[in-house]
Amino acid sequence: MELLAAHFVPSTRSRRRSHGQALALAAISAGFLMITLDATIVNVALRGIGADLGGAPSTAQWVVDGYTVAFASLLLLAGSMSDRIGARTGYLVGLTVFVLASAACAVAGSVAFLVAVRVAQGVGAAWLMPSSLALITHTFAEPQARRRALAVWGAVSGIGLASGPLVGGILVASVGWRAIFLVNVPVGLAAARLLARHADETTPRRRPLDLPGQLLAMFSLATLTGGFISAGAHGWTAGVTLALGISGVLGSAAFVLVERTVRRPLIDPDVFRDKAFTTVVAIGFVFNFCLYGSIFCLAVGLGRLRGLDALDTGFALLPMTVVTGAMALFAGRLVPRLGEWPVVAAGLTSGAVGATLVALNGSHAHLALLLLSTVPIGVTALAMPAMTGLAMASGPRLRLGLAAGVFNASRQAGGALGVAVLGTILTSGPGASVSLRRPFLLTAGAYGLAVALATLTSHEGTT
């Protein structure tokens, strides 16, 4: 009997552990799905929000970018705080803030209040994202299991970003725009309960906080983003545009200076000792610049160029949405066979092809041809899990929260600037006309640059 028990107990314990890991991953993924979905779900609701609450088109851009600017600029602090207080605690703090802010968004009575609570949503998302990566790395110690978990995490990101317009369109058409925020409340509560029961806490690691660096990072990103949005509303030579742009550049320079001189910088230079990590951080910036900007331009362009409402816009982007989800899942099987860098390069190359096709077919081609042109953009989701795996594998092992914060801050900063820059170019044609050609030509070029970086780094790693 003892031999029999010895034979079966490890198996039972293993099954229980696997079950607990699966539930922890479900909780992590549910929260992560909410924060990625909220980056794009609002795009198709902007017309309804404007009709209900009023506000200029440039203000509507801040409903999107208020979230992503706060998200991006606080990720570095949140990554450090995740190391200080433990990833599970950090995740639950972020989830609580995000759910409360979502409820506030649903009852907003003015655009100004909505932008303010969207910023609060971004604060919660900033806490949640690096903690989620650190929790996955801590929960799944075995490399193959971790790779599978990161593939799920990456797939959730791709599905959330791409399905935002469709989910938003359905909710706006059936219930109203406020429903896109209310849906986060029950999902967030369920995720918090699961995580508290099935995820172990990471070991807290105390270190001083770089508040001057954090404030400069927030100031720089907000003013640079505001400068691009102002350019679309008032022109490139307007006083407010120039003031915001110059402030952003000076703030960025001051941030670099502070980080080089402060004893405990917000971004520890040791994080960038590995060239692969530095490269994947740069590629992550370009990736989100292109993806967030593309989804924003497609959602706005389909409405203003083709006259589609929120629901029709969501369904129009369904081919891209389906391909995005499928590719994000498929990448988990492809990476073990080909390696991370080739998969990243393949996804980015497809993005360049798709952006070029949209630029050629966006304004005047048949709608069906335009929508088929978006499918290769969905294939870029191949790169998501591979990029994440590279970032977490090449970052410092004892600073996982900070490494995750740096990687995701770069991605979210790219997303915020992508919406601002490409959104401005979208509406800056003659007579303030809308054209998909200009923003998607820039997107294709940016994807091409990222392909070159990935290819060069891949070759260096094999020589």
Can you say where each PLM-predicted feature lies in the sequence?
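Membrane-water interface at transmembrane helix exits
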Residues: D83, T137, A199, T225-A233, ...
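Transmembrane-helix bundle of Major Facilitator Superfamily
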Residues: E2-A196, A328-F330, L338-E340, V344-A352, ...
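Residue-level signal for the membrane-embedded core of alpha-helical transmembrane segments
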Residues: S73, W127, F219-A222, G293
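Hydrophobic transmembrane-helix bundles of small-molecule transporters
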Residues: A151, A173-G284, C290, L308, ...
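Hydrophobic alpha-helical transmembrane segments of integral membrane proteins
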Residues: A126-W127, L161-A162, L182-V183, R193, ...
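12-transmembrane solute porter fold
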Residues: Q21-L46, P57, G226, G239-L244, ...
